[in-house]
């Protein structure tokens, strides 16, 4: 019998907060392997969040935003007897966070012409207040799953 694998996740987390999810956000924001640039963008965004939020805790705002954006269910396509059905499926925890990172980055980059740090901070603040495009995307995915509840018995 072989040894147990190393498992998922980053060891240790980021430098400032020592948090694994912040390190994963930095990796999600990173383009072309430029990790220092991504780290600066995320830390600047957290500084903006700390100055704009009431309690001044950027990490708490980030965690709340992540929980508000992460989807619980999604639809997956399955072909049954010549017809394709959208089947609602529960989302695994690793995929939940990955989708949340993807949507936050995607909708932050689409915001108006400020710096990426300001756009990311605005999207995270909106998401923590149950607003913003990334929360709308999560609600849209949940609505799709709810509309296709009738096909739940086709589960994989």
UniProtKB/Swiss-Prot annotation:
Task: Output the Gene Ontology cellular-component terms.
Answer: small ribosomal subunit
What CDD domains does this protein's entry cite?
A: uS7_Bacteria
Q: Name one GO biological process term.
A: translation
Task: List, alphabetically, the PROSITE patterns matched.
Answer: RIBOSOMAL_S7
Q: Subunit details for this protein? A: Part of the 30S ribosomal subunit. Contacts proteins S9 and S11.
Q: What is this protein called?
A: Small ribosomal subunit protein uS7
List, in alphabetical order, the Gene Ontology terms for molecular function in this entry.
rRNA binding; structural constituent of ribosome; tRNA binding
Give the family per the record: Belongs to the universal ribosomal protein uS7 family.
UniProt lists the gene as rpsG
Alphabetically list the UniProt keywords.
Answer: Ribonucleoprotein, Ribosomal protein, RNA-binding, rRNA-binding, tRNA-binding
Role summary:
One of the primary rRNA binding proteins, it binds directly to 16S rRNA where it nucleates assembly of the head domain of the 30S subunit. Is located at the subunit interface close to the decoding center, probably blocks exit of the E-site tRNA.
The cross-references to InterPro entries, in alphabetical order and at most eight, read: Ribosomal_uS7, Ribosomal_uS7_bac/org-type, Ribosomal_uS7_CS, Ribosomal_uS7_dom, Ribosomal_uS7_dom_sf
> Known NCBIfam families for this protein?
rpsG_bact
